[in-house]
């Protein structure tokens, strides 16, 4: 009788000591270069496509991340962001998930928490955003003013930006603060 009670107790202690599986990494990237000469720039900006350089950079992103265990590809709903995500989605066989929370600072914390929960046990998720939303996401993920320069973030809280189209941010979700975030350069394919 004593053995029957001890074995389940022992098993539960062992299992509780094993850490729960968690999502390992978030990759963040600004959409690739968009066409400059868009006729309806203001009213139809959300539909502005990628330039040839942007298409090359999107293909470079796919080549760079296709072996990284991408479990999901999230994007804002603009044409340029979706087109940036498309080559990686095709390479990994993952659909693109358009989510407005990628562009709404007030929804970002909940969005990031839901990704951690939904993809617990997976290796990585990509988020494609914009020059003004990538910094907001990075702040929600632990970026502090002391690492803004290293991460390519400019401006003041409330109006942070990233410059250029070549940034690829890798956030190690097992770490915290600035040490969790690395910025790499993403060159377009020739």
Residue spans for each PLM region:
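Positively charged n-region of N-terminal signal peptides that target proteins for export
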Residues: 1-5
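Bacterial N-terminal signal peptides
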Residues: 6-17
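Long, charged/polar, surface-exposed segments that mediate recognition or autoinhibition
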Residues: 131
């Amino acid at each position: 009788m004593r053995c029957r009670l001890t074995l389940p107790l022992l098993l539960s202690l062992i299992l509780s000591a094993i850490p729960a599986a968690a999502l390992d990494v978030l990759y963040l990237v600004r959409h690739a270069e968009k066409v400059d000469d868009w006729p309806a720039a203001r009213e139809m900006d959300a539909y502005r496509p990628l330039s040839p350089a942007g298409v090359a950079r999107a293909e470079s992103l796919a080549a760079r991340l296709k072996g990284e265990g991408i479990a999901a590809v999230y994007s804002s709903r603009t044409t340029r962001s979706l087109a940036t995500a498309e080559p990686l989605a095709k390479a990994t066989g993952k659909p693109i998930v358009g989510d407005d929370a990628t562009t709404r600072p007030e929804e970002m914390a909940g969005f990031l928490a839901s990704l951690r929960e939904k993809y617990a046990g997976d290796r990585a998720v990509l988020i494609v955003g914009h020059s003004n939303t990538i910094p907001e996401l990075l702040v929600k993920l632990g970026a502090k003013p002391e690492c803004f320069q290293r991460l390519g973030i400019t401006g003041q809280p409330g109006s942070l930006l990233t410059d250029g189209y070549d940034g690829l941010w890798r956030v190690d979700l097992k770490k915290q603060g600035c040490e969790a975030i690395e910025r790499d350069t993403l060159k377009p394919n020739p």
